């Protein structure tokens, strides 16, 4: 935070960092060199594919079908959109798959993370979703109506996946206990580790 403030950065920066497995999160936001309340609504873009992956595992049993794993690999490691749509249509709901992802995120306590439509060109907006983050009046970044998140929620979701791997069984996780297993969480971590797209922040 001090580095950002000393640099005189006049834009908006928000950071969420957690020391795993059970560290205290560091979370702050700065705009025009002044601290502001965090959890600004952002367009989720391809980060929403992490909730899609989690949601699909929540609704699938083991062993995970090879078809699903192949689509997940394309979605996560190459950031491709068609596999994301295929996963939701096939394993969630043909028409309302994105809203099922949103429901699963709500079940985890995330009020600002949602997916309101498929990725394909011309996909309809299934629901106009209002959240605490996109209802703020002090800062508004014109986030995408189709998918949004905030750093603390996507960061916490990643932390849950990490902790799930270390759990002794599926009942001891804080990521859909009894539904998402440590083996499935390890698969998710492996896929995320394969994402080596050379894009600068």
Where are these regions (language model features)?
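Short, surface-exposed helix-loop/turn micro-motifs enriched in polar/charged residues
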Residues: 44, 63-67, 162, 180
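Conserved aromatic-histidine-acidic binding/catalytic patches
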Residues: 39-40, 44, 142-146
């Amino acid at each position: 935070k001090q580095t950002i403030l000393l640099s005189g950065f006049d834009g908006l920066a928000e950071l969420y960092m957690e020391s795993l497995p059970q560290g205290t999160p560091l979370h702050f936001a700065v705009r025009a060199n002044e601290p502001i309340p965090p959890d600004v609504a952002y367009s989720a873009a391809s980060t929403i594919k992490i909730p899609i992956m989690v949601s699909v595992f929540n609704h699938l049993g083991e062993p995970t079908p090879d078809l699903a794993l192949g689509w997940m690999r394309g979605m996560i490691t190459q950031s491709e959109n068609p596999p994301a749509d295929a996963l939701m249509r096939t394993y969630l709901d043909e028409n309302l798959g994105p809203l099922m992802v949103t429901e699963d995120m709500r079940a985890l306590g995330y009020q600002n993370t949602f997916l309101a439509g498929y990725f394909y060109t011309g996909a309809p907006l299934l629901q106009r979703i209002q959240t605490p983050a996109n209802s703020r009046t002090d800062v508004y970044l014109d986030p995408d109506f189709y998918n949004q998140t905030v750093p603390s929620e996507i960061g916490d979701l990643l932390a849950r996946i990490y902790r799930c791997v270390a759990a002794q069984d599926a009942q001891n996780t804080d990521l859909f206990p009894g539904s998402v297993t440590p083996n499935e969480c390890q698969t998710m971590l492996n896929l995320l580790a394969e994402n080596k797209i050379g894009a600068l922040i």
